[in-house]
Amino acid sequence: AEMAIQAIESGHHVVIEKPMALTLADAEKVVYTSLRFRKQVFCVMQNRYSPPSVWIKEMVESGKLGQIYMVQLNCYWNRDERYYKPGGWHGDAALDGGTLFTQFSHFIDIMYWLFGDICNIQTHFADFNHEKLTAFEDSGFVNFNFVNGGMGSLSYSTAVWDKNLESSMLIVAENGSVKIGGQYMNEVEYCHIKDYEMPELAPTNPGNDYGPYKGSAQNHNFVIRNVVNVLSGAPGEIITTNVLEGMKVVDIIRRIYAGKSVK
């Protein structure tokens, strides 16, 4: 956030990798500075461009699913000593922020993008095998309600052995059920919806390969294209993930972490 503010004050538009900040106060400073200097802020949430994400967004907004009853978000990845190396920022509470900020904010963003804000949050956290690697939890269960109706849950862990397991979203709704799965929500695994036939989606780009560990989909080219189109005034082009949406993800994660005690 500090570097983004400095860039804006120097007269530049900015692109901010997730998360845009680690505290709501810092996120608000970015918003205030961007308004004061009339500069655009682009938040990087490239999973919004994956074909399953684009498809489910249209399904929700069109009302084809009807009332949303339940949403279950599961994020099970591997992040071990190959990732949390001594002397780096990974695992540092002040610089990393926690597992939800650095690893899984993409998927919290997708959930917020689809279903809106959450409330009535209940949490349970644990640190199974990262005591010597990080200053925070590696796993958690989170239950909540959606402000717009329905209930949800988030189950996550970086304690998975050796490699990523999955990032998935299961939706139970009035008119049917959907499950999007794979290592980074890259494929539709189940679709059974009233009076609807599932179309064939374009293939999802592979995940970012960092050698000993893997990340989310390689969609950053779409983010950069959006930046260029918006700043060049392309007709109808808007920021894919704007600064207020980036701030909302920070807000949701901070509320999940509020009063956290790790066992």
Please report, for each region that a protein language model flagged, where it lies by residue:
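C-terminal helix-rich "cap/oligomerization" subdomain common to oxidoreductases
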Residues: 28, 147, 225-263
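Short glycine/proline- and charge-enriched loop/turn segments
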Residues: 11-12, 86-94, 202-209
